[in-house]
């Protein structure tokens, strides 16, 4: 049996078709890829966005047929917080590392202007972590945990009147960062007629506001028909339940009410089966691929442009990564040299200013010293004059005292002679 191989030469426009004379064995590549993938396991990260009490945790338990044992969240949180939990699941011989990220407190605040920012920051942070791992010299993309969000389930409150402003703003901010599938939560609370009108209203508002939600791919012939049909059912009206009831000989998930029972996996009751089929069984790999090839690549492109990297130069000619790096390095060194020269000039200028300031201070101190010397000399002169005057007064006093003593003695002698 001959095998035809299409060979593409980049320098040629036409394809060359070669024939082999025998079996080589590269037709086993798909099997090798499957075995390698099964050995490494798979990663799938889901983000659930919606107001508190819409059944996000219950739906996750129902989708993956397990109990993630999440704790209820209060309605009184002052801000939105994101909590991510990672679980190891295994079905047959396929291992899945599942991360569920919940938006705790979303939509519970009076001022909801900043509710979406925490979500956007979290998604960007996961992209940044992956980018930093890619940029390492010694990187380990296979072993590092990929925390990029592959799908965002946006839970819509079943009001029946349309989307809230917060819903539109948040989905508009996220549609270029993550695959979004809107779902109508607790769909058993509104009638089927209202539900169809509600779905149409939601799609009309999304289109009017330019919100791009995830569309199931139709380029694969094996699933094109199914995906085309399922695209028309978005947003899915879902019901989740952790309770089981017995129908015949089977236990099925359901919600029981006084007026009847809603079977979760009954497609006439809700769209849960459609969501599970599209999300897990048919398009999970497409969501993972689109996250990497579209959303992450867009983030990576913007970040590299912010760093100064580009595929073309100023003349719109192709430029390699190394050339860009060398140009950035040269610019950085020139800028560094310029900064060093600027700092040196600033230092010299400050030294000169300080020297001038010190000289001026020295001059002032010298002037003060001279003044103090003059003042001191003047005080000394005055004191000397005072001392001399005092000495003269003292001598004059002594002379007068002597004169008085002599006069007194003479007077005493005169009186003695008369007697």
Curated annotation (Swiss-Prot):
Give the matching Gene3D superfamilies: P-loop containing nucleotide triphosphate hydrolases
Q: Where is this region: G4 motif?
A: 185-188
Residue ranges for the region (Important for dimerization) are 259-269
Q: Where does the protein principally reside? A: cytoplasm
| Region G3 motif, residue ranges | 102-105
Per UniProt, GTP binds at: 50-57, 79, 105, 186-194, 240, 255
Any idea which UniProt keywords this protein has? Cell cycle, Cell division, Cytoplasm, Cytoskeleton, GTP-binding, Mitosis, Nucleotide-binding
Q: Where in the cell is it found?
A: Cytoplasm; Cytoplasm, Cytoskeleton, Spindle
**What highest taxon heads this organism's lineage?**
Eukaryota
Q: A Gene Ontology CC term for this entry?
A: microtubule cytoskeleton
| GO terms under biological process | actomyosin contractile ring organization; border follicle cell migration; cellularization; cytoskeleton-dependent cytokinesis; growth of a germarium-derived egg chamber; imaginal disc development; protein localization; regulation of cell cycle
Where are the residues of the annotated region G1 motif?
A: 50-57
> GO terms for molecular function, please?
actin filament binding; GTP binding; GTPase activity; molecular adaptor activity; protein homodimerization activity
The chain positions of domain Septin-type G read 40-306
Subunit composition and interactions: May assemble into a multicomponent structure.
Function description: Involved in cytokinesis.
**Sequence similarity:** Belongs to the TRAFAC class TrmE-Era-EngA-EngB-Septin-like GTPase superfamily. Septin GTPase family.
Name by which UniProt lists this protein: Septin-2
Q: Which gene encodes it?
A: Septin2
